[in-house]
Amino acid sequence: MSGSVSPLAPKTFAEMPALRGVRMATAAAGIKYKNRTDVLMMLFDRPASVAGVFTRSKCPSAPVDHCRQNLPGGIARAVVVNSGNANAFTGKKGREATRLTAEAAAKAVGCSEAEVFLASTGVIGEPLDATKFAGVLDKLAASATQDFWFEAAKAIMTTDTYPKVATRSAEIGGVKVAINGIAKGAGMIAPDMATMLSFVVTDADIAPAALQALLQAGVEPTFNSVTVDSDTSTSDTLMLFATGAAAGDGQAKVEDAADPRLDGFRAALDDLLRDLALQVVRDGEGARKMVEVTVEGAENDAAAKRIALSIANSPLVKTAVAGEDANWGRVVMAVGKSGEMAERDRLAIWFGDIRVAVEGERDPAYSEAAATAVMQGETIPIRVDIGLGSGRATVYTCDLTKEYVEINGDYRS
């Protein structure tokens, strides 16, 4: 957890309502940090539907393997998350730590280990001492309450400077339902399935298969469209749970994601995921500016996204943003190296509303002062027209500052 809050942090935080069917508690287990909570336990009063997306890293953490193994069952009764240790690249010791944690959680809750989901975040390669959970999970299960979202978000922070929370409401068949979510992430963030840790819960009654389809569709334009440093974590986990408590209000269970009754819910879920994803970008390690990169006129949407990511992940583009330098030549460079089709003499580039380049050269009406004024803002919009087709995509990133180097140079100390 950083000592100073990001200047891009929300000015106010969402008031997180209690959500029926789920309770939470946190504790300080001393996994790495001192004088702060580092374990979160989330309990479901009744079996909840569960969906999840995870890192595509070829070196996934032991908790990710555990979640993937349990996900096909479609049911969750408990989630245990720890910060300070990723339990990744820890071999047999890591798998044993995961087994012991799931076993202890299942015993505390009174459920099967197959209904327990785990996540860890922190240093890679350090064995996780699961004995630190001894006695802790029993106490958490006994003390869990419904209105603990903000504290839950704080417990899973690492280099984050503020807790990330969001809430939305919707209607399904005329019955009001709520959606609450938390996330953590500030570094090692790149679009690849989930790109950090996030846990979203609704009191809607939705079957696991429908929930999975909703999550997979919602993640692409949100968490899969943000990047801080182009590095994909070994531990990326995004999970969505449905407690089904709204059935008590007369909400009929939804089995199919294509059911039109889910239209409002889908929109609310997508909006919440976008909110959390942008909070992650705004808390990028050392970030002082957020960057919105939009590419249009590419061969197709996939090509547009790859070009946008080439721009967003370019250290030269990101340092130019940090220095408030309207260096559109670096954007040209990033387009050219993307591997996608681009015609140099058709390119047009805008910083905000200021067109800085057109038809392969600097705009004849280019104003350094006007472009610099855009770069001095807190949010920097960069738009590129490739001039070839109708493909379009938007991704979000942040600047690259000296503080990023300092934070990551000192991370293990």
From Swiss-Prot:
> What is the protein name stated in its UniProt record?
Arginine biosynthesis bifunctional protein ArgJ
Q: Single GO molecular-function term?
A: glutamate N-acetyltransferase activity
| Subunit-level organization | Heterotetramer of two alpha and two beta chains.
Q: Which source organism does the UniProt entry give? A: Rhizobium meliloti (strain 1021)
Cite the position(s) of the site with description Involved in the stabilization of negative charge on the oxyanion by the formation of the oxyanion hole. T121, G122
EC number in record: 2.3.1.35, 2.3.1.1
Q: Which domain of life is it from?
A: Bacteria
User: What pathway is this protein said to act in by its record?
Assistant: Amino-acid biosynthesis; L-arginine biosynthesis; L-ornithine and N-acetyl-L-glutamate from L-glutamate and N(2)-acetyl-L-ornithine (cyclic): step 1/1; Amino-acid biosynthesis; L-arginine biosynthesis; N(2)-acetyl-L-ornithine from L-glutamate: step 1/4
Q: Output the Gene3D superfamilies linked to this UniProt entry.
A: ArgJ beta chain, C-terminal domain (3.10.20.340), L-amino peptidase D-ALA esterase/amidase (3.60.70.12)
Where is the site described as Cleavage found in this chain? A194, T195
**HAMAP family per the UniProt record, alphabetical:** ArgJ
Q: Keywords on this record?
A: Acyltransferase, Amino-acid biosynthesis, Arginine biosynthesis, Autocatalytic cleavage, Cytoplasm, Multifunctional enzyme, Transferase
One GO BP annotation is: ornithine biosynthetic process
The catalytic residues are T195
Q: Which family does it belong to?
A: Belongs to the ArgJ family.
This protein's GO cellular component annotations are: cytoplasm
Catalysed reactions, as listed in the record: N(2)-acetyl-L-ornithine + L-glutamate = N-acetyl-L-glutamate + L-ornithine; L-glutamate + acetyl-CoA = N-acetyl-L-glutamate + CoA + H(+)
Question: What compartments host this protein?
Answer: Cytoplasm
- Entry keyword annotation includes Cytoplasm: yes
Q: Identify the residues that bind substrate.
A: T158, K184, T195, E285, N408, S413
Function statement: Catalyzes two activities which are involved in the cyclic version of arginine biosynthesis: the synthesis of N-acetylglutamate from glutamate and acetyl-CoA as the acetyl donor, and of ornithine by transacetylation between N(2)-acetylornithine and glutamate.
